[in-house]
């Protein structure tokens, strides 16, 4: 059953998943965003912790992409075509650190240790 579900959502094997991925990619390119930019640190504290552990340059680039996207959205414009062509919406910068944070949290829970940071959503 699990292999069936994996095949169902794998863009390399499922036409509909491939079409959805292409649609999301086009929407992100219009504003110059990456998929990892869509994660909200106020919603999930693991994401907040992962962003705190990333180098400052990466976080600054993320904030700049988000500000540019909000500016373009409010102006009802898109990025110029030459800039859209060089965007990489599915290049991940957060997933590795997020996996590490989640693995550490799971290990702490398994050992019965106190969390490093409060795990409540504001």
UniProtKB/Swiss-Prot annotation:
Membrane topology field: Peripheral membrane protein
Disulfide bonds: none
GO process terms (BP): mitochondrial electron transport, ubiquinol to cytochrome c
Pfam families, alphabetized: UCR_14kD
Keywords annotated in UniProt: Electron transport, Membrane, Mitochondrion, Mitochondrion inner membrane, Respiratory chain, Transport
Location relative to the cell: Mitochondrion inner membrane
Listed name of the protein: Cytochrome b-c1 complex subunit 7-2, mitochondrial
Species classification: Eukaryota, Viridiplantae, Streptophyta, Embryophyta, Tracheophyta
